[in-house]
Amino acid sequence: MQLAQTRNHSTLLGALFVALCSLQVPAETKSSTADTQSRAPAGEADGRHDFDWDIGTWKTHQRRLLHPLTGSSTWVEYHGTDVVRKIWDGANIGEIRADGTAGRLELMTLRLYNPQTHEWSVYFSNSTKGALSPPAVGGFHNGRGDFYDQETYDGKTILLRFSVSDITADSCRFEQAFSADGGKTWEANFIVTETLVRD
């Protein structure tokens, strides 16, 4: 998951998505180990079902850093829903609607799996953008997903990392981070915690 400030802003909003699972919302109830394992990424060579655990409706809590890579510590928060649907054989699309102190977010995530490279491409967009972002590309290892892209932000070449972690049967965490030093250090700027809505 940048060539203009508007595109950067859209990517920030897209992660976790959310981009997109945050720091503080634990699952309200613990599920059985079998249930947890059935929703966790498969971790097999054919990873087209790595995101199957994410299919469903989620409560989403999102935190966005207003001014990344400036030393700022001003965050805004949003609450809403993320509805993730399966498409084709393993791909999926998520629609996020959330409201917060900085207004309303209407976001979309598209995740496509390449069976030749065994990699995922994660795309983001929002209701005002009218286009998909360049993809963040990567995969899952040991229950964590990391996806990378090189972009331009405020005239500087940066690395973008979109991560998926803390995956349980009914909760997960997404994080977008930027690096301005080639990946030596990372600053998180979009953090999302999601909790599965049970029928």
Model-derived regions: residue spans:
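Hydrophobic small-molecule pocket/channel-lining residues, especially in calycin-type beta-barrels
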Residues: 27-199
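Bacterial N-terminal signal peptides
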Residues: 11-22
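Glycine-centered signal
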Residues: 1, 20, 24-26
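Bacterial N-terminal signal peptides that target proteins for export
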Residues: 2-13
